Amino acid sequence: MAPRRQRSGSGRRVLNEAKKVDNGNKATEDDSPPGKKMRTCQRKGPMAGGKDADRTKDNRDSVKTLLLKGKAPVDPECAAKLGKAHVYCEGDDVYDVMLNQTNLQFNNNKYYLIQLLEDDAQRNFSVWMRWGRVGKTGQHSLVTCSGDLNKAKEIFQKKFLDKTKNNWEDRENFEKVPGKYDMLQMDYAASTQDESKTKEEETLKPESQLDLRVQELLKLICNVQTMEEMMIEMKYDTKRAPLGKLTVAQIKAGYQSLKKIEDCIRAGQHGRALVEACNEFYTRIPHDFGLSIPPVIRTEKELSDKVKLLEALGDIEIALKLVKSERQGLEHPLDQHYRNLHCALRPLDHESNEFKVISQYLQSTHAPTHKDYTMTLLDVFEVEKEGEKEAFREDLPNRMLLWHGSRLSNWVGILSHGLRVAPPEAPITGYMFGKGIYFADMSSKSANYCFASRLKNTGLLLLSEVALGQCNELLEANPKAQGLLRGKHSTKGMGKMAPSPAHFITLNGSTVPLGPASDTGILNPEGYTLNYNEFIVYSPNQVRMRYLLKIQFNFLQLW
């Protein structure tokens, strides 16, 4: 139903109800004009938005398990209703919304959460609201409505209208209004489960039928906490927009905002237009900067980092849908995850010829400039991705076995969907040779993209058979490289050092460029010369995943 305009009397009624917060304290909303400080109300006892409640928690404590009843979890900060109520739904209408607003000029980076709650035990309704700076617990209000559902809807819809200048019933056509909050599009089909229930289910399942090495691999790549910790490191706010909840459309909108930022950087517009584009991006993709001013994205490196963030978000969305699906049945959860990958993973015998060749390839192509770690090969899995063999361009010559590295959080997406090219809406900046799939003939060059550390020293490297065909050889980066192919099939960025062709061997029909690396004599007379080769193809059907390596990174002591 359409929200009715509040008359003055009704407005006073809503205001009076808003004072009935669950701890008996009043709460003030952040409705002050930009650039002005919000007044703080005097309170008895702990402040709703006080020092203890408003303190940014340590990253290690930020990964929460949400208790889900229905399609959306009750905000864990709503102590009065947690475990006693659920978010009210009518069909596909879920009365739960997270709003976000970033304004760099005034150091605004804030959220507003609204939920209509229904008690589990009886038909009592309430409206929970919480607001504050991203990364902070903020302030809150709990409005009780007894059994009056229409009153609860009216409060919910009016607050949504006040904060966004959009009507709740028209939210499918939501349009951001300057100076108002934006609505984060959430995927209510992707839900987190109660961890204790999940563990209980796992104990009831039969034992996994998978090889123990495959089980350990799946535990490594399907670890939700690892995914959250990685996103927190990239400043993404997992509290305001939990992983698995952002829709594909919301991520796409983030790419569109980055495209605007790219246009500003290329045009040399570092004023208002760039700031507004950054405001839009941070509003669409929530970031936690604590009390710091959200930084303006000014350089291609900073833009590239945000592109990587969205790529990781996309892969994590895929991973969480796979991990959280199909809890029913008599299969062990790991067996279900494996089946949903549609990708066979067969561990190689450490004494086999394939394992020994791959181990030699790994160690002999560790680049001399990557001296801060060594790599130990723990396991190798032969990969057979469903449909890749049939689609692969066998007709193209010059097939090489090349390296590709990525964060642990990305591997469910890679194994289930294959290596992919960046979407059309992504900015081209950040891709040295355009939107393609990148490979190396030096193992450590790709290993650097695993982003391993001393505390998290396990990573995965992929060896793919790549149909390079005829390469277009370039001496320097060019984001428009795909347009320069002119009938050729791939791009090769020429490096100063590379494995010598004298050491190349053949494995299962593919050339393996064994090391060690030697000087190629390549020099770019017009500028920077790449240290090592890069190989880029622009179509997934030129790639066939062959081996997945589980690596231990051994970081050298700094003193």
UniProtKB/Swiss-Prot annotation:
Expression across tissues: Widely expressed; the highest levels were in testis followed by ovary. Expression is correlated with proliferation, with higher levels occurring during early fetal development and organogenesis and in the highly proliferative cell compartments of adult.
Compositionally biased region (Basic and acidic residues): 14-29
Induction per the UniProt record: By high levels of DNA-damaging agents.
Residues bearing PTM N6-acetyllysine: 36-37
Gene3D superfamilies per record: 3.90.228.10, Poly(ADP-ribose) polymerase, regulatory domain, WGR domain
Keyword Ribonucleoprotein: no
Name of the top EC class for this enzyme: transferase
Name of the molecule in the record: Poly [ADP-ribose] polymerase 2
Annotated source species: Mus musculus
